[in-house]
Amino acid sequence: MPKEPVAETQESQKKGSWFNRMKTGLSKSRKNLAEGMVSILIGGKEIDDELLEEVEDQLLVADIGVNATNRIIKSLTEQTARGDLIYAHSLYKALQTELVDILTPKVAPLIIDSSKKPFVILVVGVNGVGKTTTIGKLAKRLQGEGKSVMLAAGDTFRAAATEQLQIWGERNNIPVVAQGHGSDSASVIFDAMQSAKAKNIDVLIADTAGRLQNKTHLMAELEKVVRVMRKADPSAPHEGMIVLDAGTGQNAINQVELFNKVVPLTGITITKLDGTAKGGVVFNIAETTDVPIRYIGVGESIDDLRAFSPKQFVAALFETDDKE
């Protein structure tokens, strides 16, 4: 029997281990959504309005959100009326298809435009969402793809954020541009852009402050960052990435709306999916915002930031083996 090529075997093992980590990470969300659905949809009873109402309630409890839930129930009701779905158990698979369909149009990989040098990624988000950690993981990922990377410590109000970035930088041999605690964030990022240009760096990832206690001041600061960046490169930032903590539920959508007013958001990274029962918020985000989901994080490991795959995510959530 012919052996599988080693590279393919290793790649499928990698995919498998990530899928298993994601399944483990989503265990609380699975309990909230998939296991609740199983209890409703077992048995051979026919689909009726009462059953569809129970499915609707379960979706709302699982943080799927009103818009996404209404869309799913409308589609399932139409399929039932046409006779495509008859028995309760058939809803289980149909529901997974609906969930994948919600996510698919809202997913787009991050593509680094090599004509922009450096390609500038401005990372925003409130304190505590895992912004600085995400930057470190993303830098490592891009480095692994053969890109030269530089980091800008633009969160100058949190000394720990600068230290954390410097540790990531040292660990992965990535240069970090930083100034003293409390210095001007826009100035740090401008200096980093100049330095990256001089050193012919491919990608510059800039951290920013996330203090929501003084929302007006934070938004003014971010506006200034964008304005000053554009003095160095009128097309910057080339990616405005917001980092969201899955555990914040509906609040995550409010954060997208807030930051999008001052930074042109082009990508979302959703973190901490392993620590919450609110993984359903991913569908809510996809249905209610126009910003594509780039990455998800389901753990602390440097490899636990991955490009988002709707099929894989839904399969892990429902513990099926469809992980393409």
Give names to the regions the model predicted.
Residues 1-108, 116-119, 144, 321-324:
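Non-catalytic terminal/linker segments enriched in charged/polar, low-complexity residues
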